[in-house]
Amino acid sequence: MNTKVLGIDVGKRELYYSDITGNVQGKVANDGRGFKKIKRIISENNIELVVLEASGGYEQKVLLDLAGNKIKVAIVEPTRVRNHARAAGQLAKTDRIDAKVIAHFGFCHQPRPFVLQSERKRQLRQLGKRRRQLIRNRVQEKCRLEESSDGFSTSSINRMIGFFDEELERIDALMDALIESDRELLHRSELLESCPSIGRGTARVILAECPELGSMNRKQIASLAGLAPMNRDSGDYQGSRYIQRGRKHLRNALYMVVVSGQRHNVYLKERYERLRETKPGKVAIVACMRKLLTQLNAMIRDDTCWSLDKAQGDMAANAVI
């Protein structure tokens, strides 16, 4: 496939771009003017795919600008690109070289194009991100409170904890209002809440962390969450399966659902107990998390509420994990 690819190495202030030959190469500012130049370069050179490296959020503006202009753009993990460079023998590293390597990676692997979500879904994702930041800051303050030894510090820390609690309540209210103002998000939330052990708060987190829910198959959604089992085999050696990467905060939410489900969800309780007969506890929990996610994905895809009979039927049909 001779797809013409442009790689972009994203920095805080600048964007370095290159095609796989290095003939189309340069630097623009990471702002509106720079985006216009990039779009002109894409048009003049008949670029079919633009590939960006994830860069701690600095890539978001150019990503949304290109996707909003119907340009096919993909975002990839820096680790994968760096491993690709090493495999190709490209050990030197500069911004221009990185842009060319990203283009070559895109040409070889044809990454899945970014799907532009609705404005409200993007807002929900950003509110979810801010919520995580506040929780992290509150945990840090509580740790400081435990080792505080003077009255002034203790008083200051308690004020900060109170502030974070108020901000979290405000963020939760904003997320709820956003969901209720969007018919699709509200309907999805109601479908998720039909599952025993998923309440409004958990549904809110799942919607924020996984807007792709319902648009992928079961293997893709498990991989997205980092719940797809990885093999570690070689010759006669067969290692334990493991999970890695993926969306940590989505996994955290699913973990709490599975733990709560031991009391409130008959399907999860039965599945966990059956798996526990042959597998360690954590392995059984992860397997339940993966199965739960695929069930939720199917519910959103098929526009159906939780059905215990259907879930148990799937469990019987897939008795061997």
Predicted segments with their positions:
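Short alpha-helical scaffolding segments that buttress acidic/His motifs in well-ordered protein cores
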Residues: F105, L192, I206, A253-V258, ...
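Helix-hairpin-helix/helix-loop-helix acidic hairpins
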Residues: L145-G201, C210, N265
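Phosphate- and other anionic-substrate recognition elements at nucleic-acid/protein interfaces
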Residues: M1-S155, R159-D165
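Short helix-capping/linker segments at secondary-structure and domain boundaries
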Residues: H109-F114, P211-S215, G261-Y267, T294-L308
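Phosphate-backbone recognition surface of nucleic-acid-processing proteins
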Residues: R200, R204-G281, A317-N318
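Low-complexity, acidic/Ser/Thr- and charged residue-rich accessory regions of DNA metabolism proteins
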Residues: G235-D236, S240, R271-I321
